[in-house]
Amino acid sequence: MPKRNDIKTILVIGSGPIIIGQAAEFDYAGTQACLALKEEGYRVILVNSNPATIMTDKEIADKVYIEPLTHDFIARIIRKEQPDALLPTLGGQTGLNMAIQLHESGVLQDNNVQLLGTELTSIQQAEDREMFRTLMNDLNVPVPESDIVNTVEQAFKFKEQVGYPLIVRPAFTMGGTGGGICHNDEELHEIVSNGLHYSPATQCLLEKSIAGFKEIEYEVMRDKNDNAIVVCNMENIDPVGIHTGDSIVVAPSQTLSDVEYQMLRDVSLKVIRALGIEGGCNVQLALDPHSFDYYIIEVNPRVSRSSALASKATGYPIAKLAAKIAVGLTLDEMLNPITGTSYAAFEPTLDYVISKIPRFPFDKFEKGERELGTQMKATGEVMAIGRTYEESLLKAIRSLEYGVHHLGLPNGESFDLDYIKERISHQDDERLFFIGEAIRRGTTLEEIHNMTQIDYFFLHKFQNIIDIEHQLKEHQGDLEYLKYAKDYGFSDKTIAHRFNMTEEEVYQLRMENDIKPVYKMVDTCAAEFESSTPYYYGTYETENESIVTDKEKILVLGSGPIRIGQGVEFDYATVHAVWAIQKAGYEAIIVNNNPETVSTDFSISDKLYFEPLTEEDVMNIINLEKPKGVVVQFGGQTAINLADKLAKHGVKILGTSLENLNRAEDRKEFEALLRKINVPQPQGKSATSPEEALANAAEIGYPVVVRPSYVLGGRAMEIVDNDKELENYMTQAVKASPEHPVLVDRYLTGKEIEVDAICDGETVIIPGIMEHIERAGVHSGDSIAVYPPQTLTEDELATLEDYTIKLAKGLNIIGLINIQFVIAHDGVYVLEVNPRSSRTVPFLSKITDIPMAQLAMRAIIGEKLTDMGYQEGVQPYAEGVFVKAPVFSFNKLKNVDITLGPEMKSTGEVMGKDTTLEKALFKGLTGSGVEVKDHGTVLMTVSDKDKEEVVKLAQRLNEVGYKILATSGTANKLAEYDIPAEVVGKIGGENDLLTRIQNGDVQIVINTMTKGKEVERDGFQIRRTTVENGIPCLTSLDTANALTNVIESMTFTMRQM
């Protein structure tokens, strides 16, 4: 069937900011889809609110709108652009929900917009729990015993019929938002009320738990001629009961018999045909390990996290082909881009094993609730490819960057066996490592199986890993055993530990005896057809398939899994760097291990190595490819941390030299530089012990900011007010040492300013200066940033420009530099300097049309900025006002305090742009999920130090018609100024404020921290209750002021004469 000619313009909806459950996989899918549609000759309009994505680059679509993904804003774009069609299945759950809302409100019909791909009725049939269950019953496909509820009372009725445990699944949500497993009445009440709150349809499915069944997924494709294929099937190592995004996954499935595999394959295809899916679709099934009984759990009628994994696991580009199916092409007429000879209707075959392990944020949120269930908690994931299951698992473990390199914990010896077993009996993010620890202590596999329900096949593989450890210990230095361990994915570091050698000695031993990996191609067809994809993985076998060319090469290190503090912004920079390398005539090679991203799409670079980002794995590639040099400044802290180790092997680090990278991080050297170039910084010292830190603080004066050196995303950073807090920090939060000193700085309150610049060694260009709305002390990644600055004087701007140029030249920066300043009462001070790409690079690149990462890469190759037409200093300002607003995923993470401080907590960002600051802020806040209303009720409970400041704020909110609730202390302060406020009781008292929040009486909460334990606990409960009820809670008065400005601009002020 030829493609459709009756449509010319297609609107694609992106997935918005990165949140838990919806990460970079949709940037990858959206980018592929837009390019595929353009390739077929359609005009593509894209709307997405996330500026940190490749898909929002002007080259990807014909028109790009970075606007909030709400019904009203998309409706405006539809009315303005008049597209012929809308493709909603590539923007995750956000895109689907938007399509449904636009359909129901009549916007699509009024503007003659057709929906492409899967029909709306099919989407609703798959997403609406009631309709789905009915369809399954008609098809005779078993679903778990279940009931649809719209109220908590109905849930209790169902519980009386079937008993516990019960699984709650809210309709039309993603990442399991609001869902969970209930074991008792209290949990049932809490989870169902939460689920009804998060479901746009106020509907939950309650099902009898089948926890303990195997969880199997099939990624399938279908076209309008009813051709349907299975792209990939995957098995969750964790049994049913843990969200698939939080499960360790293997592809292809390892424990199914052929009969089981074919049975589940047939069911998956039967279901997608019955639903009439056109495009990609993910089917999740549960299989009883002891019989042929199975249940269908759910169907996602769209491109998903699993389809990104399936695409990277097989090399089969699901999103690209799904977009083409949506415009009428069929599987049997599209070539498979990997082989270039076989058609897309051939099912991929794998001759390797894939392991995916989720990346959790608990290294940042140590107090977070770690227990895993049906609600997703991982921020990202890693994937590894091997020829044995053990090899792929161990490669994936060392890709995670938890400081864990093997199946066990660094301090594993210190736990007693009872504690280890206790940890295994709970499903959490560390269970895998505790299982390794238990096997090491001789626990039987039977006992572990009974505790976890993990299939014996996998437990035997874990046992094999531990057995090899013992063999290495018994045959220290034996080459046969070294080779054998390498076949099963052991790292040099792990072998060194068992051989009683250093990692470097094991590396040298391998080199002398020619024990090196070869690189195999990922070709979708197990080498049955000719294939020329430049997509490789390393393994210890004989034949190397990665042909080294004569061209000069540059190797770019990616940024690994998405986590808080290191998001998709770094992938954006990596991709742009690769494009610049290719334009300059070099061969570009990427090393990365994140299956969700654009950088690991094999069509982006000349060669892609899907490998862990460790010294050993990267050196193996460098030894084969012998690149001109390695670029580390675009891969976040992951890549920067490898620079030292690679340089020791004689590898050339391109761009800013290693010595200068270290000068920016080393306290004493950096201070010496600042004195030399005459740039002030807050008074500070470094401490290598608690005693030294106390002496430093006494000299500098409280409050002080304390943090470890060499970290990203402000990990373990705190503002402390006295000796007791400082002692606490030094003994609990960090292990200070001469190699890793702790920095103690004077805490200056003032405006925080962020600047990104590019330097070629001679010229420094500054694309833009951003002002933060929150004063210094809130991590820059969690602050609202505004471009251009709104409140700075000409003198301050000139000083910022001068200091930035001095710093970039003083550090001999070649490439990018990011600097944070604070403007305090008496001048501009530099807070920190990062000699690398930063979180704000995509944001500024979009605003100014200056392709910052590409210019930086060209400077690294040796081109001059003046030859490219740029003058030194701040570049001309773009028209309009732009804000970057942070987006948090607190509703997915229990027990995490949402107070903003120097440690980063946001998972993503949105951009708001308009002609005035208030309008841009309105868009930024709306896009980040804060509903801005021009009237309502605000609850204020602030610490004593903020009471004076909150008066003015209360007065303004009162004048625009907001009703004020306040706790007694705050209310008394407001009464002094004749501002009316209703007094609410403290937690547990009369007219308790938590009850008022839960009853929906409050639209905004303003709550600032009070130090001191009891109050902190109250404050923590208040903040968590707001999150669980979906109410914006502002913990910084600066954010509250900005929101008030927006409210004032939307409404009229009522003041008596």
UniProtKB/Swiss-Prot annotation:
Question: EC number(s) on record?
Answer: 6.3.4.16, 6.3.5.5
Q: Which pathway does the UniProt entry assign to this protein?
A: Amino-acid biosynthesis; L-arginine biosynthesis; carbamoyl phosphate from bicarbonate: step 1/1; Pyrimidine metabolism; UMP biosynthesis via de novo pathway; (S)-dihydroorotate from bicarbonate: step 1/3
Protein name as catalogued: Carbamoyl phosphate synthase large chain
Cell wall biogenesis/degradation is among the record's keywords: no
Listed binding positions for Mn(2+) 4 are: E832, N834
From which source organism is this entry? Answer: Staphylococcus aureus (strain JH9)
Quick one: which gene encodes this? Answer: carB
Free-text comment about domains: The large subunit is composed of 2 ATP-grasp domains that are involved in binding the 2 ATP molecules needed for carbamoyl phosphate synthesis. The N-terminal ATP-grasp domain (referred to as the carboxyphosphate synthetic component) catalyzes the ATP-dependent phosphorylation of hydrogencarbonate to carboxyphosphate and the subsequent nucleophilic attack by ammonia to form a carbamate intermediate.
Q: Give the source lineage, highest ranks first.
A: Bacteria, Bacillati, Bacillota, Bacilli, Bacillales
Q: Which parts of this chain are annotated as the region Allosteric domain?
A: 930-1057
Domain ATP-grasp: residue ranges: 133-327, 671-861
Its top-level enzyme class, in one word, is: ligase
Positions annotated to bind Mg(2+) 4: E832, N834
Residues that bind Mg(2+) 3, according to the entry?
Answer: Q820, E832
Signal sequence region? none
- Necessary cofactors: Mg(2+); Mn(2+)
The entry describes its oligomerization and partners as: Composed of two chains; the small (or glutamine) chain promotes the hydrolysis of glutamine to ammonia, which is used by the large (or ammonia) chain to synthesize carbamoyl phosphate. Tetramer of heterodimers (alpha,beta)4.
Ranges for the region named Oligomerization domain are 402-546
- Give residues annotated as binding ATP 2: R707, R746, L748, E752, G777, V778, H779, S780, Q820, E832
Q: Identify the residues that bind Mn(2+) 3.
A: Q820, E832
